[in-house]
Amino acid sequence: MTSTKDKIEKLRKILLKYEYFYHTLNQSIISDAEYDYLFRQLYELELKNKELIPSDSPTQKVGSHILQKFKKIKHFSPMLSLENTFDVNGYLNFKKRIKKSIHNNEPLSFCCELKLDGVAISIIYEEGIFVRAATRGDGFEGENITSNARMIDSIPLKLKGIDIPKRLEIRGEVFMLKSNFIKLNKKYKLNQNKYFSNPRNAAAGSLRHIDPNITAERKLIFSCHGCDFFVKTNKELTTHYQRLMKCLSWGIPVNKEIVICSSDIEIIQFYKKIAQKRNFLDFDIDGIVIKVNSLELQKKIGSTTKSPRWAIAFKFSPKERITTLNDVKFQVGRTGVITPVAYFNPVYISGVMISKASLHNKNEIERLNLHFNDTITICRSGDVIPRLLNVIEIRRCDNAKKIIFPSFCPVCNTELLENIEEKLIRCHSGLTCDAQKKQALYHFFSKKSLYVVGLGPKIINELVEKGLVKNPIDFFYLKDIDLIQLKNVGKRKSIKIINSIKKCKKTTLKCFIYALGIPGVGEVVAGKIANYFIKLDKLMNSNILELNCISGVGKIISNNIFNYFSTISNREMVVKLIKQAGIFLNDQEIHKINSEKTYFFNKKIVLTGVFKSFSRIELKTILLSLGAKISNNISRKTDFLIYGNNFGSKFFRAKDLDVKIINQEELNSLIRIKE
């Protein structure tokens, strides 16, 4: 007589076999009704014999508990992104770099696959059993989505076959079929009056849903595109293609559109073939991925901190749609730059609704020869940024009105001035223009300037509209009674903002210069100016020749700085901020050190992580004052990497390049500043 244990084991094996054929081989060998019947039998038997339920049972993909939150999980090796190209020349340059890096003329073979538009995840198997899954996250640390990934039918909970490594990492994409996406949106909109913008967003939201049962309902699909065995298997695999086929034999889904190419013609033909099939597929792709097939060569070629050097994504040209231009509005930026924005009938491109696109400047309007109600072609550059490509002039009405760039500011009616060199048109009325005033004030109190907690754009806009503030000085005379009359600002929040305004008075010369919002003067340039002049009065009284002497500050920015401090109203405002509002530039301690060469003088430095003794902005200011050059990217020219807690990929890149690494304790000692 067959025991209950034997019945359960037999049912599991049958169901796992059917799942393998259906999800991996795309073959349905039994009807849905038959499958459901067997599944129900197993479920009821396990319900009565819970001690007999293993983690790889088909029933464990339903009925999981609801997660409260996703914990962070570190990847065994970084999950890198891919370099992109949109044309043949980009691919040829990629191949040329590879040839150069391997120093030989041996024929190369490439493994070409579909670039699925999904969510990248990592899955770990131990002894062939699914143990964990994580999203890419920042490449080094992702979200632990183990419970939700278990709900995806195409992810096997137990591998089958031989030569399965003790530990195996599978990487691939989770995506949603277009047909399922349409059904989900109909249901979602009906119940919640909301919808997902595209299948990828739907897949990402479903994968991270707090309830794994919802993930199960969404019918997500997984496809493997790579793996890591950690240790050598009994049968050594030498190519990427062999690894994928091995994964397939273990029951891991791999997309069937894979080819090995040995010539440029073969790769381009595959690209064209997939481009033609793209719209007929039931899932989104945005190109093909070209990988060096040899694992030995992959290792030799290596990776950057962002992407493997041995692979590239050959993306499809941006999709285009035809629509009608309704209007062009001219927006006024913080520095007075006038930017035309085209508004048109909404169109869907790559699953996203688009109704406007920046026209950048006057030259673009003239190039397009835009008229109202023109028929226009819209695309998404890189499948991301909306762009107006061209006008179909043959469809233009005879009486169509041409769009003319204004001669006066659309907000304050001041005459606009054109800078031929910068190809920009500006309103020079500064803070007397409401549009510039609002954005300039928000910039003045933003994080890298004189940061005030809780003082966001909405509050600033309302303060300006009510006439409570006209310039930065007015903020230092605000009282909590002024703030309470604003929307969504109570007594507690108003006191918090007032206290933060008082605290922001103590700042650095660099932050103060940056806060002024001089055109072209960003955080780095502000630091260089502060480091050069040391004192605010020296900067205010400088001439063009002095400004041109500052390394990294070009003629255009020098002129902008000179013009700013040559304007009487600007000088008066700066003086009032210091003398009346009481802004204190706390750089004295740094100035003493600045006069002599230090350990960091003229050294290229990169920062990573969180520091105990300083904020990132404070540390940058100190290092700049010591003559250092701050960079965001690690290279062979970098002299030092300074790291704090929770450091990122730059740390590992620095190790690879033998860059000197300095920790927080060493840093405090070297800069000779008390904590």
From Swiss-Prot:
Listed name of the protein: DNA ligase
Names of required cofactors: Mg(2+); Mn(2+)
Binding site for NAD(+): 32-36, 81-82, 113, 136, 173, 291, 315
Function: DNA ligase that catalyzes the formation of phosphodiester linkages between 5'-phosphoryl and 3'-hydroxyl groups in double-stranded DNA using NAD as a coenzyme and as the energy source for the reaction. It is essential for DNA replication and repair of damaged DNA.
Any matching Pfam family: Nlig-Ia
Keyword ATP-binding part of the UniProt annotation: no
Protein's UniProt keywords contain Lyase: no
Protein family membership: Belongs to the NAD-dependent DNA ligase family. LigA subfamily.
GO molecular function: DNA binding; DNA ligase (NAD+) activity; metal ion binding
Binding positions (Zn(2+)): 409, 412, 427, 433
Residues of the BRCT domain: 595-675
GO annotations of cellular component type: cytosol
Listed EC numbers: 6.5.1.2
CDD domains documented for this protein: BRCT_DNA_ligase_like, LIGANc
UniProt keyword terms in alphabetical order: DNA damage, DNA repair, DNA replication, Ligase, Magnesium, Manganese, Metal-binding, NAD, Zinc
Organism name: Buchnera aphidicola subsp. Acyrthosiphon pisum (strain APS) (Acyrthosiphon pisum symbiotic bacterium)
PANTHER family registered for this protein in UniProt: CHROMOSOME TRANSMISSION FIDELITY FACTOR 18, DNA LIGASE
Catalytic reaction equation(s): NAD(+) + (deoxyribonucleotide)n-3'-hydroxyl + 5'-phospho-(deoxyribonucleotide)m = (deoxyribonucleotide)n+m + AMP + beta-nicotinamide D-nucleotide
SMART domains documented for this protein: BRCT, HhH1, LIGANc
Active site (UniProt): 115 (n6-amp-lysine intermediate)
